[in-house]
């Protein structure tokens, strides 16, 4: 990636990269937003002239100002909402790279960007949406969801066909993309970047409880919480009646908040500092994901924190050599054990 900062443009001009996402990354709410923020930090730190275009054109504080402090121009507000195509017409020839990572925003802006720029288009696949939806359809035995998956596959294939470079976090999805698009440049890249390593207290005899981390607005997370509480936790309580599950994640709907009890704490949104306290005191992170795609940020974060994990196969999918760190369990009895 370092060649991006030197191989475009000419003379002393910094190469310009336009980063397009559906909204300003709120990194303490969603794993995907944390990934986007880390990549924006990386790209700006490489010396690129980075411009950020949120598809909703909203300025969200403090996150927008934090991007500005990194030297990133944010193309937000009423003027850009009404005039983004004119801005592309006027400035497109100075854009060297365009970075997409969501199918909806790529679909909305890609044609205009192709018409107004000569930029190389990089698409970073957070996960294959069609694969996640197809797995959901299988779990729920719902043909309507499979129809939605088929629509997303057409959308994503069109985007991939019109991109110059494809990035993915998952080895599994890299293989799928290489098979479907053998002439494309496809690379697996890290989900998160960390500047240092934590030094947690390794005396797990002092720790207690279970921890689940994940935005409750994400349907696979809601399904995972419900399945764990309904099918797995009662089996755990037969052996460890005092076990408590802490659920961290913003935007919990009524179906999740209704699970709150002495044994299930629906904590909701927390700050990074509060989350660190939970990681430092928990005995085990659970990842009971039954359907999904891509690499799971909750798994990478737990590994970084040095906390043991119990996960399903889907939860561990796509991570290099993960079998040396955790053995997947897909049935309730095995997961509880």
Residue ranges and their predicted role:
Residues 26, 118-119, 123-150, 175, ...:
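Acceptor-binding helix/loop patch of EC 2.4 sugar-transfer enzymes
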Residues 254-256, 275-276, 292-296, 314-320:
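Short glycine/proline-enriched, acidic/aromatic patches that form the donor-sugar handling elements
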Residues 88-107, 122:
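Short N-terminal targeting/anchoring amphipathic segment
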Residues 1-33, 39, 63-70:
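Non-catalytic membrane-proximal stalk/linker segments that position and tether the catalytic domains
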């Amino acid at each position: 990636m370092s060649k991006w900062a030197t191989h475009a443009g000419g003379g002393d001009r910094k190469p310009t990269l336009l980063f397009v996402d559906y909204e300003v990354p709120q990194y303490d709410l969603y794993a995907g937003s944390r990934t986007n923020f880390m990549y924006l930090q990386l790209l700006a730190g490489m010396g690129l002239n980075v411009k950020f275009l949120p598809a909703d054109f909203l300025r969200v504080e403090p996150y927008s100002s934090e991007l500005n402090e990194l030297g990133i121009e944010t193309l937000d507000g009423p003027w850009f909402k009404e005039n983004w195509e004119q801005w592309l017409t006027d400035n497109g020839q100075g854009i060297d790279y365009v970075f997409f990572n969501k199918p909806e925003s790529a679909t909305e802006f890609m044609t205009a960007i192709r018409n107004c720029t000569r930029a190389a288009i990089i698409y970073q696949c957070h996960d294959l949406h069609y694969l996640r939806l197809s797995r959901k359809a299988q779990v729920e035995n719902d043909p309507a969801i499979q129809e939605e998956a088929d629509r997303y596959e057409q959308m994503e294939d069109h985007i991939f066909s019109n991109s110059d470079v494809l990035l993915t976090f998952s080895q599994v999805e890299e293989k799928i993309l290489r098979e479907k698009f053998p002439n494309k440049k496809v690379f697996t890249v890290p989900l998160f970047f960390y500047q240092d390593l934590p030094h947690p207290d390794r005396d797990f005899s002092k720790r207690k409880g279970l921890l689940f981390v994940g935005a409750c607005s994400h349907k696979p997370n809601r399904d995972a919480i419900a399945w764990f509480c309904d099918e797995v936790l009662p089996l755990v309580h037969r052996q460890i009646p005092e076990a408590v599950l802490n659920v961290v994640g913003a935007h919990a709907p009524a179906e999740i908040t209704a699970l709150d009890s002495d044994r299930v704490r629906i904590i909701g949104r927390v700050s990074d500092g509060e989350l660190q306290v939970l990681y430092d005191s928990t005995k085990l992170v659970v990842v009971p994901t039954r359907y999904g795609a891509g690499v799971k940020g909750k798994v990478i974060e737990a590994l970084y924190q040095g906390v043991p994990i119990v996960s399903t196969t889907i939860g561990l999918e796509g991570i290099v050599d993960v079998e040396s760190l955790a053995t997947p369990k897909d049935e309730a009895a095995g997961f509880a054990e």
